[in-house]
Amino acid sequence: MLVVLLLIGMAAHSSLIVIAACILLILKLTNVNFIFSLLERRGLEMGLTFLLLSILVPLASGKASWQEIISSLASFSGLLAVAGGALATSLNTRGLNLLKADPEIVFGLLLGSILGIVFLHGIPVGPLMAAGITALLMQLARIFKP
């Protein structure tokens, strides 16, 4: 399966899939399987931490001043960003609840993420948001079910 993912990543020119597949292949071939459980338990948290670090670098480096931040938040797009952030966290909560209730759904999320990377040139940011959107779509399907 990992070789298939590697080939898909190479065909799609997706460095993210290629790197992830290579790392997992190396871990598997070197028989350090304990890292799999660590990645399974804490990988999402570690990935989100690095994502947050990259977003906060302008604050830490001084490239963004408090005046610029306040000005940005007071703008229309800044207010929409606050609303978007609040909505995203709400969807993430729904996603977490869905993953807890139906853990097997992660395979569909994985396939959907791969298809999104390959065909839509998307960037996977994590299963929580994908699960949150799935939970929302499931709720809408129940509402509009004939």
From Swiss-Prot:
Protein name as annotated: UPF0756 membrane protein PTH_1817
Keyword Transmembrane among record annotations: yes
Localization of this protein: Cell membrane
Domain of life: Bacteria
GO cellular component terms listed in the entry, alphabetical order: plasma membrane
Membrane topology type: Multi-pass membrane protein
Transmembrane portions of the chain: 6-26, 46-66, 69-89, 105-125
InterPro entries to which the protein is assigned, alphabetical: UPF0756_TM
Keyword terms of this UniProt record: Cell membrane, Membrane, Transmembrane, Transmembrane helix
Similarity comment: family membership: Belongs to the UPF0756 family.
Cysteine-cysteine disulfides: none
